[in-house]
Amino acid sequence: MSQKQLWYEKLHSSFGQYFSIKEVLYRDKTDHQDLIIFDTEEFGRVMALNHVVQTTERDEFIYHEMMTHVPLLAHGDAKKVLIIGGGDGGILREVCRHAGVKEIIMVEIDQDVVNLCQEYFPHHHAGAYDDPRFQLKIDDGAHFVEQTNHRFDLIISDSTDPIGPGEHLFKSSFYQACRRILNAGGLFVAQNGVCFLQQTEVINTYQRLMPYFSDVSFYQAAIPTYYGGIMTFAWASENANLRRIGLNDLESRFADSGLKSCRYYNPFVHFASFALPQYLIEALAKKAPK
């Protein structure tokens, strides 16, 4: 009996997770990062960049639904959406489900990620790249937000961790530029790692967003392959009421949206996602401006 091939993630140096590989589908170095796509028994196809899991077929819906429907339904009338990163197509797929959105721009630094995910993860994008509202720009997201004259109602930063190509998407200058290109009433959200294991990252984001937005907070979801507890998503706007919408209003917006086949998101999950664990509340309070 042949020994199974194992792949070990290298996000943390002293602990981690591994996957038993059925088949390596692709492995190479792009212009920006090491990329591997492999098939597994438990999680289907998996993509990792620089030895860190980015997405899996089995649980991607949790991440993509929460990164998309929470801010879109909280905003209530977003017409123009900017996606930073998101080359696997999952965020795009979910944004395209909102008929009220009229323009979607996605800025991805790595063309190879887009091409390979279209080939190996067809259910992630589900044809969304052909949506007439969509434009793809191959560029560094930090450079794009510094230079663009476009304005947006929602910015979704679907970045990697703050290492390698994704490092610039966690800097104060990036958040300042995002604030500049948001319309009045606009909203910014970003993935921010697993707060129990990456609390420094969460606190850094909080401190760097505070100078540019009057309301900065986080919401959360549990995503199995982002192990170690709940994953946090940064939330920044000029209107604190956007994260305080009542359950009745959320149910009404959800019903009107036509989102009938969500697998994770619902208005109750949305409402509850802003409830943060006490250790995180206390850590953020220590860093809040006096």
From Swiss-Prot:
Domain PABS: 5-238
UniProt superkingdom: Bacteria
GO cellular component term, pick one: cytosol
UniProt-listed Gene3D superfamilies: Spermidine synthase, tetramerisation domain, Vaccinia Virus protein VP39
UniProt pathway annotation: Amine and polyamine biosynthesis; spermidine biosynthesis; spermidine from putrescine: step 1/1
NCBIfam families, sorted: MFS_SpdSyn, PRK00811.1, speE
Assembly, per entry: Homodimer or homotetramer.
Functional description taken from the UniProt entry: Catalyzes the irreversible transfer of a propylamine group from the amino donor S-adenosylmethioninamine (decarboxy-AdoMet) to putrescine (1,4-diaminobutane) to yield spermidine.
Protein's name in the database: Polyamine aminopropyltransferase
Species of origin: Hamiltonella defensa subsp. Acyrthosiphon pisum (strain 5AT)
Native organism taxonomy: Bacteria, Pseudomonadati, Pseudomonadota, Gammaproteobacteria, Enterobacterales
